[in-house]
Amino acid sequence: MNTTLRALSVALAAALIAPSAFAATAAIPTIDFHGYMRAGVGVSGDGSEAEWQKNKLGRLGNESDTYGELELGSEVYKKDDVSFYLDSMVSMVSDGSNDNETTLNDDAQFGLRQLNLQIKGLIPGDPNAVIWGGKRYYQRHDLHIIDTKYWNISGSGAGVENYTLGPGAVSLAWIRGDANDVDYRVDGDSNVNINYIDLRYAGWKPWAGSWTEFGIDYAMPNTTKKQDSYGGLYDADNGVMLTGEISQDMLGGYNKTVLQYANKGLAQNMVSQGGGWYDMWNYVNDATGYRVINTGLIPITEKFSINHVLTWGSADDITDYTDKTRMLSLVARGQYQFTDYVRLIGEVGGFYQKDSYNNGTSYKQAGEKYTIALGLADGPDFMSRPELRIFASYLNDSEDGKPFEDQTANNTWNFGVQVEAWW
């Protein structure tokens, strides 16, 4: 009899649990998992690995941090052409010096990078257009080998993107990117609210194998009445950044040219390798700047490819004591595949920058970097990742600025191992 009761109990429990388990399973959406990471170990000519001017000399063998991004997203609703997608991302950065790196003593820093909702299918006539709101990386334009986003208006905001118009698509966004600790005189109220209007048009192909994108970013510092009463740095004008780029299929790869103009607080991006942050820490109402970028990835042979980034930037009056700033940077990375998984990588970079001041003096910066590495990757493509690299680098300050070995040397070397991945 006990056996019969036990059997009935199990059957009843199964009958009660099954519907709820089925419902729970049906209610759980698919989770998309994406991310990025880099980490490693290295030494230099004087202690731990050195990092110097990587946005102008190249990042290979010139990165000393541990960095990661973890992204979780899910389409939480889908019916016909209508979908609701939730996205989230956190990041972590540290110097990689310890086993357990926490926020204690700023050993590691964690950040909330993305938290947004993307709605598709509610705009009449274009089921692929997206209405979005929240915090996100917004259509960032990347130069990977120098770790620079030359067009990057990211943050909390809202907008409509990829609405088909003619041969391309238009995107319009309102994004917030505040400036912190602007002026110590305004105690407890030194952060300035800055709002951006970002308008882009992408996808027009003027001829076969080409594609374009154009955009305007309008930055509006939104000071409080208390900040206005202090004047000074808080008397910041609205600024604009214009971007136009054209890309072309070339020899099995591509080439891209970017032209940019910026003024006011956005002008300094043209010489700092920035992507659109507004400078509230200098007097910049008369500032103007220009930038030209050429980049490409060309397969020279079946096994050898070259990726390059050439940047020329010019800016005037980006501080109250600076007249002109000129910057030139060239970085090239070559890659030879021994097998599908083993490659030899070389990277060479050089830059020159001159700041001319209103008092007639000037300050020059220049340098070079040479790196050779053995890479192990999950395929033969140039950007195949994950990748493990064993590298050696030589860095040199040709203006004798002595940035290395406690400001006693104008050159140093790095040796180490780094892994990089995205998924």
Swiss-Prot record:
Catalytic activity: beta-maltose(in) = beta-maltose(out)
One Pfam match: LamB
Residue runs in coiled coils: none
Alphabetical keyword list: Cell outer membrane, Ion transport, Membrane, Porin, Signal, Sugar transport, Transmembrane, Transmembrane beta strand, Transport
InterPro entries: G_neg_Bact_CarbUptk_Porin, Maltoporin, Porin_LamB, Porin_LamB_sf
GO cellular component: cell outer membrane; pore complex
Main function: Involved in the transport of maltose and maltodextrins.
Family: Belongs to the porin LamB (TC 1.B.3) family.
Name this polypeptide is given: Maltoporin 1
